């Protein structure tokens, strides 16, 4: 059976034919613009290509006008670190000595709601291929997860499937999962967030970019065969929110094969080493349509593609289906004719399917696609790649003043009971139920991962040079004040890297928001972008790349605005990375609190746990103080252990440092704040709890003073196994038991964990 195509000639002959542009996610004005570009109606294949490439996911059409602010705030000094920046598959930074690091965060939110396991698994696979496409070896992954209420039935369906998908794919690839964050909130019910981060390493001279150059060069498709999975994944899932009772969108969810990707990684690295690749692009969202049109648009000529040569795993696929398929584990390379044979030999060695599917031509800005010997696409690739740019209206919501009114702070009858309630809350409880499903130490280069502020990896076995990576974000803070919320996410990720002893070096982000057609959401988005861009400039670290995910809402209710910020740091010797846990030295430790504590409970976990809702202003952060903390920790060998203060404040930081070794801690809250509740649970920014041996105390206090960092001795450790404060006492083991039980009790017997949404 031969598929009948809608050809270019047929499109010219049938100008009045009705087309399903709306079902493909296009607006009337967008369809009209396509007709204007082509001078005729588009073919089915052209309509598919434009709908995919003009989706929010691929075109950034609603966010692009605001994202330009990142470029406007990047100084020459900041830019000098970047080898590849915004617009590439992933940001790449030069960290000196000929080494480069690439890292990026990508969202796979909507697919993970529809089919949790495959949605999350292919999210990991996609971000890993982004890193591969830069010429790098992927070395680790992280994940940022957001779910509905922890006790909601649908959370019990989604969370176990997502966690299994992340672990199943990442573990099979042999990549350590070195950290992450899991948050529960009502706003994510029906729209979970699954943001995956990957980091890779390469030599500076091995950098690869996505472009098709050189007349006569061949376009090679390699990896898995192309099937029907993921058809329309970008345009259907990336540009639509979930309505109550809406028909499930399972056909648009991709299916991953991590073992095929593991082989593809090694195949790519050998192809790079052999010098046979001119340009490279992974096939992710938008599939072959996206990969080939982007390569053509970035080159100095044109491209001809023959879909008859694409290896298929389904029969009778149309041109539109082949172009839009989001089958996983595929890459597209541009190769000179004299290297094609070598390219094929390497692919054959790794048992990777490859095919020559096209050629670079000297006809600039042309993109021709043939199927069954017929021309089905004839369009300028620049118009496909650039897409429309919208100046969406935005306005500060009327409810913003009301939500920022000073909250009434709940006062507990017992501080000990409040402490127990905090550590056992889903917001702060142990994530071991999740993280124990991930392999943290595969490959043997993980230095810090479990219960660490950031993941630390060795990247050079000879010099012990390494990197530290952290990713953070607070939707609660960002809803109260989007600009400050983004700054706080940046500050926490920066601080998490700094407390390991690494020097923060670069930033990436994943901006998760509701519908861009909502003026409130667009105001939140603009404010968050400005907060992150201005904050990065103040810290003098560049934003190397990012991702935007819109339409995260159920019906008309958007999620909490959630900018996830990743920070990469460099450490000269990973063996000198600072410890997280107390009890690591053979004598009592003195505890020192760096930074100033204020009564700041807006958006805090205490406000959430005590039933205070979401009210007030978030903590205020002066990023100059974060930079001072980084200066304090770099090269500091006097610190025995360190932990940043964030969610839950001093109490949670002290418990998390003490629990592993069952250390006793005696805290003096009076030197922190006159109010014991504030001293325990305030979430003031720019604070770190450190410990040191007594003979290093004076030197540490002097160093803090020289840098202008407030520092007070807040306590000491002992072998009692109890945490004492304000005349109260609670056993560390009792807190640990409550802390450890929450997630297993909620999800240990979840039913239907991998079922699709009905």
Curated annotation (Swiss-Prot):
Annotated CDD domains: PurL_repeat1, PurL_repeat2
Residues the entry annotates as binding Mg(2+) 2: 130, 282
Key words of the record: ATP-binding, Cytoplasm, Ligase, Magnesium, Metal-binding, Nucleotide-binding, Purine biosynthesis
Active site per UniProt: 57, 108 (proton acceptor)
GO cellular component terms listed in the entry, alphabetical order: cytoplasm
Annotated disulfide bonds: none
Chain sites annotated for binding ATP: 60, 104, 509, 546
Catalysed conversion reaction: N(2)-formyl-N(1)-(5-phospho-beta-D-ribosyl)glycinamide + L-glutamine + ATP + H2O = 2-formamido-N(1)-(5-O-phospho-beta-D-ribosyl)acetamidine + L-glutamate + ADP + phosphate + H(+)
InterPro entries, A to Z: PRibForGlyAmidine_synth_PurL, PurL_linker, PurM-like_C_dom, PurM-like_C_sf, PurM-like_N, PurM-like_N_sf
Compartmental location: Cytoplasm
Pathway(s): Purine metabolism; IMP biosynthesis via de novo pathway; 5-amino-1-(5-phospho-D-ribosyl)imidazole from N(2)-formyl-N(1)-(5-phospho-D-ribosyl)glycinamide: step 1/2
UniProt KW Magnesium keyword: yes
Binding residues annotated for substrate, in chain numbering: 107-110, 129, 254, 326-328, 549
Pfam hit, one: AIRS_C
HAMAP family found in the cross-reference section: PurL_2
Protein name: Phosphoribosylformylglycinamidine synthase subunit PurL
Originating organism: Corynebacterium ammoniagenes
